Swiss-Prot record:
Its EC number is 1.1.1.25. This is Shikimate dehydrogenase (NADP(+)). It comes from Haemophilus influenzae (strain ATCC 51907 / DSM 11121 / KW20 / Rd). NCBIfam families: aroE, PRK00258.1-2. The active site is at residue 65.
Length: 272
């Protein structure tokens, strides 16, 4: 049976095995998908051994996306620009192909929500690894992006890297333009740490829809809770993005595109 896995550290909390095995059942694919704890010191050796033993592909989560990218032989454009991958596939010639399905997963979930139209103004909070993975697909979807982060130099470098692909502007968190935003995306890790993104409430009130790339089981993320406390109710967490990026990884491996919405709805119901 073809073997796949998700690698991360920590990994016990990962929903990827549940999601991927549901996608496999839906599409009648015979495969096994498991969670693997990566060793912070020996991850590269572990991953190469995993493929040498016959595995067909894997997902990569924190903190290994950049390290896994370095091990690949070939790359998609979106992985190359992000300098990180969340998906590896073993090709027929034995080479490793790296892709990053985070951004296309986000775009697919925004389409599910009917929140994606050309020429929207989008504010993204945060310029870390999560942001790097989503910028190219958003720009390809003709979004006008304002990228805000506490460390302006990091934001500026990232915006300059992606400027050839669309309209993107770098600002510091305390100089976000006072304009209306069709969509505000939280790409900071505030949703995981229990904090909230350090953005002025008056800025948030200029938004129409609010998407947190984090999710929390059975409760609101801090960012979603903050939005609701301001009376902003057009909100979504990132669980749909998680299922959608998994579906795009699955498609890369198996050549079949699952119906991610039905799997999302099943799992979301179970999480409440």
């Amino acid at each position: 049976m073809d073997l796949y896995a998700v690698w991360g550290n920590p990994i016990a909390q990962s929903k990827s095995p549940l999601i991927q095995n549901k996608l496999a059942a839906q599409t009648h694919q015979t495969m096994e998908y498991i969670a693997k704890l990566g060793d912070l010191d020996a991850f590269e050796q572990q991953l190469l051994a995993f493929f040498e033993e016959g595995a067909k592909g894997c997902n990569i989560t924190s903190p290994f996306k950049e390290r896994a990218y370095q091990l690949a032989d070939e790359y998609s454009q979106r992985a190359k620009l992000a300098e990180a991958c969340n998906t590896l596939k073993k090709l027929d010639d034995g080479k490793l192909y790296a892709d990053n399905t985070d951004g296309i997963g986000l775009v697919t979930d925004l389409q599910r929500l009917n929140w994606l139209r050309p020429n929207q103004h989008v504010l993204i909070l945060g310029a870390g690894g999560a942001t790097k993975g989503v910028l190219l697909p958003l720009l390809q979807a003709q979004q006008n992006i304002v990228l805000a982060n506490r460390t302006f130099s990091k934001t500026k470098e990232l915006a300059e890297r992606f400027q050839p692909y669309g309209n993107i502007q770098a600002v510091s968190m305390d100089s976000i333009p006072l304009q209306t935003y069709d969509l505000v995306i939280n790409a900071t890790s505030a949703g995981l740490s229990g904090g909230t993104a350090s953005v002025d409430a008056e800025i948030l009130k200029l938004g129409s829809a609010f998407y947190d790339m984090q999710y929390a089981k059975g409760t609101d993320t801090p960012f979603i809770a903050l939005c609701k406390s301001l009376g902003l109710t057009n909100v979504s967490d990132g669980f749909g993005m998680l299922v959608a990026q998994a579906a795009h990884s699955f498609h890369l491996w198996r050549g079949v595109m699952p119906d991610f919405v039905s799997v999302y709805e099943q799992l979301k119901k179970a999480m409440l």
